[in-house]
């Protein structure tokens, strides 16, 4: 997706991405000064000390980096009513446009880093109001076709729709930037250069050789998952 950014936009994204790691170290030092234990256990290992705190802040900043990529590329459209740039992904596809609008990442309006950070902070503040301080959770990745976590449980999900959406291909737009900032925190999650695609449950003929093979792959996989 490198061609979807101007050289100036790539410089901005690369700079913000590099600063995420600097911010993590600064947060760690501040957390230690505030009295959090410096146990060296990261957030991926379930840590609760200074390092885990700093890495969690880094994850939130990476969310802002994703917003920056979405609103800082050469396919952002102009919104005539609000008079501001709009994001690339208005739907689950990359659009074609005649011209593009570009915000100022160092400004204070649409497309600015400070706007992304403040928006994410407000969203988390509202979310955390409903989460107990001592509440703990666990998230894992597993193949839906062979996992047993959902046995005897009701699971509500929005499944893939044949070849309607190229989830993994589109995810690479954000994945490469997240990996650049977070692979030291989540080495297993970001082990690959791009998102895994071989086992993705979508009926894409170009990946399976024909429409019939793609449909068969999708139906068999969906049957196992169900």
PLM regions: where:
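Nucleic-acid modification enzymes, centered on SAM-dependent nucleic-acid methyltransferases
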Residues: 1-153, 160, 164-211, 222-225
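Soluble or luminal CAZymes and related metallo-dependent hydrolases
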Residues: 217, 221
């Amino acid at each position: 997706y490198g061609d979807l950014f101007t050289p100036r936009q790539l410089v901005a994204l690369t700079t913000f991405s590099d600063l995420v790691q600097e911010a993590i170290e600064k947060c760690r030092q501040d957390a230690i000064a505030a009295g959090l234990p410096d146990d060296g256990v990261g957030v991926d290992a379930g840590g609760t000390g200074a390092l885990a705190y700093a890495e969690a802040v880094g994850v939130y900043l990476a969310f802002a980096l994703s917003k920056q990529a979405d609103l800082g590329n050469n396919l952002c459209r102009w919104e005539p009513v609000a008079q501001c740039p709009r994001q690339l992904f208005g739907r689950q596809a990359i659009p074609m446009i005649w011209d593009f609008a570009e915000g100022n990442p160092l400004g204070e309006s649409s497309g600015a880093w400070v706007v992304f950070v403040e928006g994410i902070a407000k969203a988390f503040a509202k979310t955390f109001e409903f989460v107990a301080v001592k509440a703990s959770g666990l998230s894992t990745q597993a193949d839906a076709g062979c996992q047993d976590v959902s046995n005897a449980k009701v699971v509500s999900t929005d499944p893939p729709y044949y070849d309607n959406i190229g989830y993994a291909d589109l995810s690479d737009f954000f994945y490469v930037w997240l990996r650049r900032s977070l692979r030291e925190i989540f080495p297993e999650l970001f082990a690959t250069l791009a998102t895994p695609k071989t086992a993705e449950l979508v009926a894409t003929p170009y990946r399976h050789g024909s429409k019939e093979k793609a449909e068969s792959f999708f139906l068999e996989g969906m049957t196992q998952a169900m």
